[in-house]
């Protein structure tokens, strides 16, 4: 069985984590070996970096610092989890990856896309996701869902303009490379979103079986 790298992306409150679990369950029902992971994080060291990135109580973080911490966590994650799992033929389902960097640090923070691309090449080499699922929904809906979860992290405390830029950056990437992306309407009911995921299963299983 061929290793497959699938990332799940979207703004706050889009339901990525819930739907990642659902997709993993559906793949495992078909005998697929699935590794679930997330960014920032995925290893003990990368999770410590995640805490720095999300903690709203720390000193104000410069945008460049944020970008470099994201890629530092990613480098560790790739070496310790993602590359070994793909080499074993697993399907890796990752909650956020480099598209999130282009969306949040590029779109939201306004950092240079060229700089992000340079770091992407340095850290990842030629490794890119085989498929990215973007869970899209109106910003106000996502922020309301995030607020309902309780205490907001450092990113969730950003204003609406930030998240509008994040959303548009995601959608622009999907337009630029439609063969690598599927945009799902995360504003639907959970059952409807999962029906859309089910519709993708045959092609995913075919790719897994090479």
From Swiss-Prot:
Organism in which the protein naturally occurs: Ectopseudomonas mendocina (strain ymp) (Pseudomonas mendocina)
Family: Belongs to the thymidylate kinase family.
Keyword Transcription regulation belongs to the record: no
Protein name: Thymidylate kinase
UniProt keywords, alphabetically: ATP-binding, Kinase, Nucleotide biosynthesis, Nucleotide-binding, Transferase
The protein's Enzyme Commission number: 2.7.4.9
GO terms of molecular function: ATP binding; dTMP kinase activity
GO CC annotation: cytosol
Domain of life from the UniProt record: Bacteria
CDD domains assigned: TMPK
Example GO BP: dUDP biosynthetic process
Presence of keyword ATP-binding: yes
Catalyzed reactions: dTMP + ATP = dTDP + ADP
Pfam family, one: Thymidylate_kin
Record-listed ATP binding positions: 10-17
Gene: tmk
Annotated Gene3D superfamilies: P-loop containing nucleotide triphosphate hydrolases
Protein's job: Phosphorylation of dTMP to form dTDP in both de novo and salvage pathways of dTTP synthesis.
Top EC class, one word: transferase
């Amino acid at each position: 069985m061929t290793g497959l790298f699938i990332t799940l992306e979207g703004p706050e409150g889009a339901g990525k984590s819930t739907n990642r679990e659902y997709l993993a369950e559906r793949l495992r029902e078909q005998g697929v070996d699935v590794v679930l992971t997330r960014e920032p994080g995925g290893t003990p060291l990368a999770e410590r970096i995640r805490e720095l990135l999300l903690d709203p109580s720390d000193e104000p973080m410069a945008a460049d610092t944020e970008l470099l911490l994201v890629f530092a966590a990613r480098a560790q994650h790739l070496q310790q989890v993602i590359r070994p799992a793909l080499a074993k033929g697993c399907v890796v389902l990752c909650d956020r990856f480099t598209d999130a960097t282009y969306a949040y640090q590029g779109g939201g923070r306004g950092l240079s896309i060229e700089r992000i691309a340079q770091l992407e090449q340095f850290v990842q080499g030629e490794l890119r996701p085989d498929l990215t699922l973007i869970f899209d929904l109106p910003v106000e809906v996502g922020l309301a869902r995030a607020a309902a979860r309780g205490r907001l992290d450092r990113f969730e405390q950003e204003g609406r303009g930030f998240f509008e830029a994040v959303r548009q950056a995601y959608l622009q990437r999907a337009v630029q490379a439609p063969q690598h992306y599927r945009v799902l309407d995360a504003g639907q009911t959970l059952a409807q979103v999962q029906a859309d995921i089910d519709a993708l299963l045959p092609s995913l299983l075919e790719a897994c079986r090479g």
